Amino acid sequence: MSGVNDIRSAFLDFFKKNGHEVVASGPLVPRNDPTLMFTNAGMVQFKNVFTGMETRPYNRATTAQKCVRAGGKHNDLDNVGYTARHHTFFEMLGNFSFGDYFKDVAIELAWNLVTKEFGLDPKRLLVTVYHTDDEAAGHWRKIAGLPEERIIRIPTSDNFWAMGDTGPCGPCSEIFFDHGEGIPGGPPGSPDEDGDRFIEIWNLVFMQYEQVSPDERINLPRPSIDTGMGLERVAAVLQGVHDNYEIDLFKALIHATEEAVGVRAEGERRPSYKVIADHLRASSFLIADGVLPSNEGRGYVLRRIMRRAMRHAQLLGAEEPLMWRLVPALVREMGQAYPELVRGEALITETLKLEETRFRKTLARGLNLLSDATGGMGEGDRLDGETAFKLYDTYGFPLDLTQDALRQRGVTVDLEGFNAAMERQKAEARASWAGSGEAATEAVWFSVKDRTGATDFLGYETEEAEGIIAALVKDGAMVETAAEGEEVAVVTNQTPFYGESGGQVGDTGTIEGEGFAIEIKNTQKKGEGLFVHFGQVKKGTVRISEPVSLRVDHERRTRIRANHSATHLLHEALREVLGTHVAQKGSLVAPDRLRFDFSHPKPIAEEELQQIEDLANEVVLQNAPVVTRLMAVDDAIAEGAMALFGEKYGDEVRVVSMGKGTQGEKSGKTYSLELCGGTHVNATGDIGLVHIIGEGAVAAGVRRVEALTGAAARRYLDEQERRLKAAASVLKVSPGDLLPRLETLVEERRKLERELSEARKKLALGGGAGAKAGEEREEVGGVGFIGRVVEGISPKDLKPLADEGKKSLGSGVVVFVGTSEEGKASVVVGVTDDLTGRFSAVDLVRKASAAIGGQGGGGRPDMAQAGGPDAANAAAAVEAVRAALAG
């Protein structure tokens, strides 16, 4: 029972037998909790239950919760690899009581599990309690039979837990395992407590108080229990090892890395293997939960983790991207417990491969810069902040990666200098933006909401309604009236107008009253439930408290509805064709088009796009009813409804279902089932037709499809057909023969371009037929020299030309200046290897570049290239090189 998977199962089974509901792990990105970057403890998904804001159909629960501690307040990233127990990703086993049992039962359950189920020797266990918690100490004596010397009272906050400055709180009791006298370290509370002998394996939190103010704490009416046991730690204890990275799970991941790299995980290399194994888990689980590498927020933390592992892969000698090759080993070890790894394996693999391929392009150059900057440094020295910032800004090195690279040499980074450089860049960015006053403008809506309350939205049932003008806003301030011709924002007590949200654009239409009319150009949601109509007064004077008639533009709303329903069909079709890793990352639902952004690591093949379009249109042709139901959010998710990752949902949600599947697992089942607050067609046939018009990348790991529906799709296809026939007519072939004819013409053009390029090269190397470059040779300053201006040659052809020139010279310098019809010039300088000690092609090309108005140039000592806007001075560029040689 000592394998990680066995331990996890034994823990959950034990508490299930003791009346606990086994609850699946929450996602790593907490739902509806902006205070946390990542889930970092088992109680996170129960936070609202503990505070009384949410109820569950059970009052006892147990979980194996995936957690990440990297970035923000809880950050173990810097220590991973160099200690026995630090992780960025770990599993927290826990049991919870929501007002059911309390200290005595919690202690009895914990003691029975560790001593009877896990079989740990009671003589090697000791516990801590908060120094005033006599009740807990008494239970440990009575239930576990522990003597007083093995019940250690701790007066610090280590043994008192609080959710925040206010809210539930209470004392803790921790269970420690004694590894024995051969391991250095003292018991908890002693000066040597940070040693490895006594290891905490379980923390029991007794939530019995509520902190109502800094000076006031009251008893909770229903005390609760929250416990947390680190799976990796207890596995190390049960497997008889002192390092978490020696348990079976990490052994498998490290072995897979050894096989991929071909080097044993020994000595100084061992920390790199630990880093890779840990960061592989963190990266893979974050990607599976919808986080993708980016330059901000959670995505940047993921990128930092990935790039730190990638540097350690490079230290081990990996010459190709490594991380993606280890994913199958991780899925084998953890996929059964966490099926999201299996579902997301393709996305995880491609994302890791793409990120490492990109980073490797700058990794070597960044490490060279770091080496040059710290070449003479040793213990106690500091790298200047400007260089650290350059590594971050230019080469993509997160600060902690630079710190990690310098760690073993004892070199630190000037953090003040780094932060100053970062702030300077931000200040420059802010200065380049004049500002729009949006913050001040947005503040008015809080005042409006206080005055009017939320708007009653009627738009699911009707497109016309009567209402009362509750507020008018002009130029960021509330007003009593608005005159003809003025732009105004209108808030009514109720409205059929949909406010822009969830990717769907806001409605347009009219608001009319006695003697006035307003053309509504957009509708937006402001804050919680305030619908704001933006428009222009077309007639009369508008006043608050006036009764009005509100009419949505029916034809426009109809097209929006069709496009919104089509996005649902495309979403499901994308998942069916590409895989279940596809998750919505954004959308636009407009009257004239739709676009859908989703997680996928690579371009979609044409045949896959056709499959996706065909699947969506199959459901359109079913003319199936589109059904909307109001459901409890948990019931909707349990039924299989797709939710937008990270979106905040209330207790009750709208669930939109449409169509029947015809293939695979979907056959005979509801085709599309999503949580959605938008407006939709009554039946799928109302969509008419779905046609994909584009696919491309939005960001790393995020793709976008664009599509048209109904009449817009038909007009688009009609126009495409018209153009096809016109093109066929120009080439005097039938539309069916157009493609082979075009392929023939393209190949003929390529052949002519190659022949023209060769002719220009020959001309550049010496003129007419039979001429040789050697015939153009000069002696300048005792050095062989060829210099020519070549009209109409592309910059990419100059380098091969210079190679030919160098070859024909044997020893010497060549310069070729190409000119274009646009009046621009390109120059290349080549220096044979025997002369690079005397002449640098880079120095020479910069002299030539100056003559044609260029700003320098670059390359190697034997070959360099530059450009400039002044082709009229091409000959002067040649002369500049000639003069430099003549010296």
UniProtKB/Swiss-Prot annotation:
GO biological process terms, semicolon-separated: alanyl-tRNA aminoacylation; negative regulation of DNA-templated transcription
InterPro entries (UniProt xref): aa-tRNA-synth_II/BPL/LPL, Ala-tRNA-lgiase_IIc, Ala-tRNA-ligase_IIc_anticod-bd, Ala-tRNA-synth_IIc_core, Ala-tRNA-synth_IIc_N, Ala-tRNA_ligase, Ala_tRNA_ligase_euk/bac, DHHA1_dom
Enzyme nomenclature, EC number: 6.1.1.7
SUPFAM superfamilies xref list: Class II aaRS and biotin synthetases, Putative anticodon-binding domain of alanyl-tRNA synthetase (AlaRS), ThrRS/AlaRS common domain, Translation proteins
Alphabetized UniProt keyword annotations: Aminoacyl-tRNA synthetase, ATP-binding, Cytoplasm, Ligase, Metal-binding, Nucleotide-binding, Protein biosynthesis, RNA-binding, tRNA-binding, Zinc
Purpose of the protein: Catalyzes the attachment of alanine to tRNA(Ala) in a two-step reaction: alanine is first activated by ATP to form Ala-AMP and then transferred to the acceptor end of tRNA(Ala). Also edits incorrectly charged Ser-tRNA(Ala) and Gly-tRNA(Ala) via its editing domain.
Protein's UniProt name: Alanine--tRNA ligase
Organism listed in the record: Chelativorans sp. (strain BNC1)
Upper taxonomic lineage: Bacteria, Pseudomonadati, Pseudomonadota, Alphaproteobacteria, Hyphomicrobiales
